[in-house]
Amino acid sequence: MFIGGFYSLDIETMLKTQQTVENADECKEKYGFRLMCDVENNYNQKIYTNNGRTASVYAFNHCREKMKGKKVLLPDYLCLSVISALKAAEAEYDFYHINKDLTIDIDSMEKAITQDTGMIYFIHYFSVPQPKAVTDKIKVLAKTHSLLIMEDITQALFSRDKERMGFGDYIVGSTRKWYPMTDGGIVAVRNGLDGKSLPLMQPYDESVYKELLISSLRTYYDTHPDAMKQLYLDRS
């Protein structure tokens, strides 16, 4: 991996994998992503997207009817891609406070809830699930005020704690923060949750295609310093 730039993909390994995997089911079994926080198999509906932002857009659009006229309550420490996803889904939002130790300020969250609030969006930061006292309170607040819960596991993709994780109505995350890949995201919908059926959008636009191309060529140019690099540079 190249920190601060594009990932490097090993073409030979990719081709070798393609030759050894005979069908899609075998590929899913060998290389499919497991939702580690889903200890009790409550999320049978999972969609893999091109990035975490797209995953969030799908989730917000899935509950658009339920959220009509409502706002999403966000932590005041988050990636701007979440705001971008909300704007893409034409959703309104407010904020609650995050403590210095990256736990949720429950008092701030509770005070921020109004009759216009329709969803709590929260994040497990840096692989550490939010404390049980916090997640228990989130569940109570959601039940009391009839709120949806969206759980962002981008930073805790491999964490597992059935009492503190895996209880949101939606789970979203960016997989590329952990895997050596150019991009990737996941959205999971809790079993039994009704929502609007959505067609899958074309996941890769021109910029993502260029990223994939650059990542594929990087190793070659790193190991062949005399090769003509103009094609690579033109697409960087």
Map each language-model feature to its residues:
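Conserved PLP-binding active-site segment in aminotransferase class I/II-type PLP enzymes
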Residues: 1-68
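Active-site phosphate-binding strand-loop segment of PLP-dependent enzymes
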Residues: 102-197, 206-207
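Hydrophobic anchor at the start of a short beta-strand
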Residues: 46, 93, 149
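Conserved core segment of the aminotransferase class I/II
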Residues: 180-236
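Short loop/helix-cap segments at secondary-structure boundaries that form the rim of catalytic
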Residues: 39-42, 85-88, 159-167, 221-230, ...
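Conserved PLP-anchoring active-site segment centered on the Schiff-base-forming lysine
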Residues: 61-115
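Short, polar loop motifs at secondary-structure junctions
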Residues: 32-37, 77-80, 153-161
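Short, hydrophobic beta-strand segments that form beta-sheet elements in well-ordered domains
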Residues: 26-30, 72-74, 146-154
